[in-house]
């Protein structure tokens, strides 16, 4: 039974060690409020995606709410004509998507003349922005870019050719400029090749559902997935599937899209819902620092509901993956639930874990999370060390080998190395032993050396999210030199000054960049609390709360 928390401070305890530091009422209230807010959210806290919304505009003219989507499309175009967030190379795919959608609407001719004029201007500026982009890579490692980019370039050329032949109903005499060249590093034949490959097999793997729009036009009808809700949790994939059908979209498809559009004023995120990812990452961030007693029952329910002995999916319709599976095991342990490691076994390849079975590129952070799950499980169940001990040692060595010489780790899920480095350092500090000391210290030195003048950290510019990760890296070492103290003090000031200062920059990789706001808030909240309590780690709370087993 869970006791009533002290009105000033409270500590959550379970049979699994958690934070035992002094916790301010403000932190406890904020953390509990964040958990409660997430629990009431049926989709997850991400912003609309320009790329995704433009794909729905292009493929689903029958879906109510198009005027709002067009307003969003026009409003989101940058002064240089591009769309999207992040540096210019990240803007390639959203700009292709925006241009193609505007061309599709102009060809249909169902918009008011003023809207058509604005769309034509957006096309002209967008094509100019595409011509100004670099001609070759390296390009970001975002989801299925190797299929999505060539497919959209081909669609733009097709739209331009049809407008040249037929014109646009609302704009006499307007013609778009030349279509974009396919950037170096992409293969124009790949979408058709992938479709042909699986047509010969007779089935389409689930891994293509989330990015189905990239190959939808190349597949035979027999390979079109038939699912009742959003295909691969993606509005764009769902709209593309409906566009390939010979009949009108089903009521279920329309309802699934409308339910998401209602949340986003007609627009769409790249994945919905993201509840599994959001809840696991938020729970882990708070539990590693301090999980308020008021939030414990909710987080325990999340952990119990999400854990699956067959493996965990990050969202409905996606493949099972080692990252979410490891986090489900880890979060369960942090809140005193005992779940086995067996679901992770299917992803083990002999030296480390594949994030997906049959994946193209691996994930550092999935393996860092797996190391924490493995290490924690063995500490609680020492009789399993003969089974998992050798695997843990191999995983530790593999993770160390992935470190770059200057100190950071990269990862395919995040544009910033601070995320993967914080995750790797956390795993190696707890479960790497003496073998990991050099790797951790190298990462700490790198973090110290890359702090910005304002006390922040960031790959493109200082952000609160990346500063929270850097704080975790610096606090991982027991050797606190004066340089550490100064860096942490400056970080604490920066995080305090930036609180509530606006939306978080998009740094996470899906098809384009996105920002999982609740998860970011949890990391920042936890980092600020850890910085507050580092000054007096020996203080203890007067009324401990004992978590129910």
From Swiss-Prot:
What reaction is this protein's catalytic activity?
Answer: (2E,6E,10E)-geranylgeranyl diphosphate = (+)-copalyl diphosphate
Q: Which domain of life is it from?
A: Bacteria
Q: Which cofactor does it need?
A: Mg(2+)
Q: Which Gene3D superfamilies match?
A: 1.50.10.160, 1.50.10.20
Q: Which InterPro entries match?
A: SQ_cyclase_C, Terpene_synthase-like, Terpenoid_cyclase/PrenylTrfase
GO MF terms listed in the record are: copalyl diphosphate synthase activity; magnesium ion binding; terpene synthase activity
| Signal sequence annotation | none
- One of the GO BP terms on file: diterpenoid biosynthetic process
Q: What family is this?
A: Belongs to the terpene synthase family.
Q: Which protein is depicted?
A: Copalyl diphosphate synthase
Which PANTHER family does its entry note? (E,E)-GERANYLLINALOOL SYNTHASE, ENT-COPALYL DIPHOSPHATE SYNTHASE, CHLOROPLASTIC
Top EC class, one word: isomerase
From the record, give the cysteines joined by S-S bonds: none
Query: Which residue numbers does the motif DXDDTA motif cover?
Result: 321-326
Motif (QXXDGSW motif) spans which residues? Answer: 451-457
Give the species.
Answer: Streptomyces anulatus (Streptomyces chrysomallus)
Keywords, comma-separated and alphabetical: Isomerase, Magnesium, Metal-binding
Described function: Involved in the biosynthesis of the labdane-type bicyclic diterpene labda-8(17),12(E),14-triene. Catalyzes the conversion of geranylgeranyl diphosphate (GGDP) into (+)-copalyl diphosphate.
| Enzyme Commission number(s) of this protein | 5.5.1.12
The Swiss-Prot or TrEMBL note on domains reads:
The Asp-Xaa-Asp-Asp-Thr-Ala (DXDDTA) and Gln-Xaa-Xaa-Asp-Gly-Ser-Trp (QXXDGSW) motifs are expected to bind to Mg(2+).
């Amino acid at each position: 039974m869970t006791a009533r928390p002290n009105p000033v401070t409270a500590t959550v305890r379970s049979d699994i060690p958690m934070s035992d530091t002094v916790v301010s009422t403000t932190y406890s209230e904020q953390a509990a409020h964040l958990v409660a807010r997430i629990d009431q959210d049926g989709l997850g806290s991400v912003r609309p995606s320009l790329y995704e919304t433009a794909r729905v505009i292009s493929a689903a003219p029958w879906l109510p709410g198009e005027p709002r989507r067009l307003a969003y499309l026009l409003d989101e175009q940058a002064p240089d004509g591009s769309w999207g967030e992040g540096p210019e190379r990240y803007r390639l795919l959203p700009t292709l998507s925006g241009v193609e959608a505007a061309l599709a609407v102009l060809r249909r001719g169902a918009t008011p003349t003023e809207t058509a004029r604005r769309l034509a201007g957006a096309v002209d500026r967008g094509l100019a922005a595409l011509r100004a982009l670099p001609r070759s890579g390296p390009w970001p490692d975002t989801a299925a870019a190797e299929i999505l980019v060539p497919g959209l370039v081909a669609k733009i050329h097709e739209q331009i050719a049809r407008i040249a032949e037929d014109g646009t109903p609302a704009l006499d005499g307007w013609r778009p400029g030349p279509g974009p060249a396919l950037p170096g590093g992409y293969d124009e034949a790949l979408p058709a090749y992938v479709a042909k490959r699986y047509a010969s097999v007779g089935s389409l793997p689930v891994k293509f559902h989330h990015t189905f729009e990239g190959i939808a036009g190349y597949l035979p009808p027999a390979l079109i997935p038939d699912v009742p809700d959003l295909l691969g949790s993606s509005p764009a994939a769902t709209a593309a599937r409906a566009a390939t059908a010979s009949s009108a979209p089903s009521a279920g498809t329309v309802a699934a899209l409308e339910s998401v559009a209602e949340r986003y004023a007609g627009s769409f995120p790249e994945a919905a819902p993201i509840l599994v990812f959001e809840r696991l990452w938020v729970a882990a961030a708070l539990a590693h620092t301090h999980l308020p007693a008021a939030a414990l029952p909710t987080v325990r329910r999340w952990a119990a509901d999400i854990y699956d002995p067959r493996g965990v999916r990050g969202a409905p319709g996606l493949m099972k993956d080692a990252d979410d599976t490891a986090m489900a095991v880890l979060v369960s342990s942090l809140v005193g639930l005992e779940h086995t490691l067996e679901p992770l076994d299917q992803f083990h390849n002999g030296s480390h874990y594949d994030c997906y079975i049959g994946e193209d590129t691996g994930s550092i952070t999935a393996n860092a999370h797996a190391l924490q799950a493995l290490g924690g499980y063995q500490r609680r169940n020492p009789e399993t060390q003969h089974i998992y001990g050798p695997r843990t040692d191999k995983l530790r060595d593999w993770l160390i080998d992935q470190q770059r010489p200057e100190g950071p780790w990269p990862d395919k899920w995040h544009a910033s190395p601070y995320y993967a480095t914080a995750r790797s350092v956390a795993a190696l500090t707890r479960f790497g032993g003496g073998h990991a000391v050099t790797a951790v210290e190298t990462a700490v030195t790198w973090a110290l050396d890359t702090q910005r003048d304002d006390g922040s950290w960031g790959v493109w510019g200082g952000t609160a999210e990346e500063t929270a990760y850097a704080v975790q890296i610096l606090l991982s070492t027991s050797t606190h030199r004066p340089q550490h103290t100064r860096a942490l003090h400056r970080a604490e000031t920066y995080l305090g000054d930036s609180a509530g200062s606006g939306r978080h920059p998009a740094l996470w990789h899906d098809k384009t960049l996105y920002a999982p706001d609740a998860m970011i808030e949890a990391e920042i909240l936890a980092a600020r609390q850890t910085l507050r309590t580092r000054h007096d780690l020996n203080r203890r709370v007067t009324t401990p709360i004992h978590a129910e087993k």
